[in-house]
A protein has these predicted regions:
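Active-site-adjacent bridging/hinge elements
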Residues: 43-49, 97-98
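Active-site flanking loop/helix segments enriched in acidic
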Residues: 49-66, 75-78, 104-108
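Acidic/histidine metal-binding catalytic segments
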Residues: 87-90, 133-145
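His-Asp-centered metal-binding catalytic motifs of divalent-metal-dependent phosphohydrolases/nucleases
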Residues: 90-110, 117, 121, 125, ...
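An active-site-proximal "capping" alpha-helix that borders the catalytic cofactor pocket
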Residues: 70-73, 115-132
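N-terminal core-entry segment
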Residues: 72, 77-85, 94, 100, ...
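Short, contiguous, pocket-lining structural segments
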Residues: 39-43, 62-69, 86-92
Length: 241
């Protein structure tokens, strides 16, 4: 394995506890306005282009728009809060992670297996990306991040893109993190407005709550139960209140 791939594909070890990263603050560096034109999806990469087309077909529009918002939020977070990691991280690897992180929630995939959606989604993403020609290291990095994207906790470590996908998805879903104070302030208002303008949230939280309830009903053992209280405790993003 190439050592350079560790940084490029986001394998760098990070604390699992986001609170240990941010301390008592919602950010390390004060967020600044960032245009989405500065953090475009790298569709010049043929693997990203194929995955984008696949995601548009496989996912409901609500989930696809969520995945795109997560991409932009994560790019803003990595550039402004973790510039060292951002300088090495492949935007393509990050884009693939975002586009596929909820692939396990599609109507077909949710009922295709008894496995929890995040775990099956990681396996599915690995298969899809191998088929699209991703390197084994890139495909595995994406798969691990997807498998652990609901594994929010305070013990141990996680990959960099694993932590990043947690931060970006939690920000879009509820805007409140169980271990980070005032988490809704992590993204500049202007950046958030541009992202939401390009990929409107609509009734995303209501829609995804329905997906969660369906998985709980058919898979009472599912990993989603670990995060469900976080979702239900915040029905609206702080910025929308």
């Amino acid at each position: 394995m190439c050592q350079n791939e560790v940084e490029v594909n986001g394998w760098t070890s990070m604390p699992a506890n986001a609170g240990a990263i941010f301390g008592d603050n919602p950010f390390i560096n004060v967020p600044e306005a960032l245009s989405i034109d500065e953090i475009k999806l790298p569709i010049d990469d043929p693997i990203v282009e194929k995955t984008l087309s696949y995601a548009k077909t496989a996912l409901p529009v609500e989930t696809f728009n969520h995945s795109m918002r997560v991409y932009y939020y994560g790019m803003a977070i990595t550039k402004q809060q973790f510039p060292k990691q951002a300088s090495a991280l492949s935007p393509s690897t990050w884009a693939l992670t975002c586009l596929l992180h909820d692939i396990g929630t599609s109507e077909h995939n949710l009922t295709a297996t008894r496995m929890s959606f995040d775990i099956y989604g990681g396996i599915k993403a690995l298969d899809v990306l191998n088929g699209f020609g991703a390197t084994p290291d890139q495909a595995e990095a994406v798969a691990e991040a997807i498998i652990r994207h609901q594994d929010v906790g305070v013990h141990g470590t996680i990959t960099y893109i694993g932590q990043l996908i947690q931060l970006a998805t939690i920000y879009d879903n509820v805007g409140a993190h169980p271990y980070v104070n005032d988490f809704g302030n992590l993204i500049h208002d202007t950046t958030r407005a541009q992202v939401q303008g390009a990929h409107p949230p609509g009734e995303w939280r209501t829609f995804f709550s329905g997906v969660i309830q369906k998985e709980e009903a058919i898979k009472p053992w599912c990993h989603t139960k670990k995060m469900v209280n976080v979702m239900r405790n915040r029905s609206r993003h702080p910025a929308e209140q």
